[in-house]
Amino acid sequence: MIAWYGSVEQRRTLGADLAAGKVLGVWNTEPAPGVTVAEEGLRGAKSYATGAGHIDIAVVTAATSEGKQMVLAHAADPARADPSAWRVRGMRATVSGTYDLTGLPVNAATRLGAPGDYEREPRFSAGAWRFAAVQLGGVEHVLTLLRDHLADSPAGQAPVHRARFGKALAAARSAYLWVREAADRAEAANAGPETISFVLLTRGVVEDAGLTVMEAAARSIGTRAFFVDNPLDQACRDLAIYLRQPVPDQALDRAAAAFLAEDAWTDDPLW
C-alpha cells in the first residue's frame, strides 16, 4: 500500500525501514466506536492487531467525513497494547490484541494516500491473494508433516494411507496453482474487475485444501496428532484459525455470480 499510495518520501522511508529489519503490519479491525481522525490526531483503538506492541509500524484505517483514511502509526509501544483478549487455540505467537491509537499524529508524514484508497477496487478484494498465499504456506506445512510421518512409519505402506495422502497432495497443489494465477492476475498492470472474481474463488479453493489436508493428517496419524508436543498439533491449530477470513460464503457467492454473468476465461484459448 505504501508502494501504491505513498509519497516519494514515504516510499524512501519504507525502503530504509525494511533494510533496517523493521516489521510493518496492517490493522483494520476495530471495536466500536472505531478509530477516527480528530484535531489532536487519531482517536480510538484497533482489535485483532497482530504484533501489537511488538511490530514497528502499522498501516491503520481511520474514519473521516470523506471515507477511510490510511495512517502510518507507531506500533511498538507496549503501554498501548492489550493482548489479554487474545485467548485463542492457535496463532498465540502473533501476540494479537487491542492497540490504543489515541493521540498518535496525523500529518503529511503519516497520512497515506487519500480517503477511500484502502478499499479501492480491484486492489482491495483482489489483494486477498496475499492472505491466501499465507494460508497456502500453512497447508503445505501440514502436508509436509503428514508426509514425513507416513514416510517414516509402516503406515506409509498401506494403500488407504497412500490414497488419502494423494488426495491431500492434489488438493494442496491445486491450491498452489490457483494462488499463483491469482497473484499474477491481481498484480498485472491491467488488472480489472474480473480479477476480483478469480481471487474470490481462489479463497475457497485454498480453504478447502486446508480442511482436506488437516483431516487427512488427523485420520492418518490419529490421536498422536493432537498431543501438544506434536508439531502437527500447533500447525493445525494455527492454520484452522487463519483459514477463518471474513465472509467466505459471500466471497464464493460473488465469484459464482460473476462467472455466471460472464465467461471468466475469455482470454484463455484452451478454455
What are these regions (language model features)?
Residues 151, 174-205, 215-226:
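C-terminal helix-coil-helix/basic helical segment that borders enzyme active sites and/or dimer interfaces
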Residues 7, 42-44, 101, 139, ...:
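Buried hydrophobic positions in well-ordered alpha/beta secondary-structure cores of metabolic enzymes
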Residues 223-271:
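Glycine-rich phosphate/cofactor-binding loops in nucleotide/flavin-utilizing enzymes
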Residues 137, 166-173, 200, 204-211, ...:
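Generic structural signal for well-ordered, non-transmembrane alpha-helical segments
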Residues 10-11, 154-157, 161-164, 191-198, ...:
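Residue-level recognition of alpha-helical structural elements
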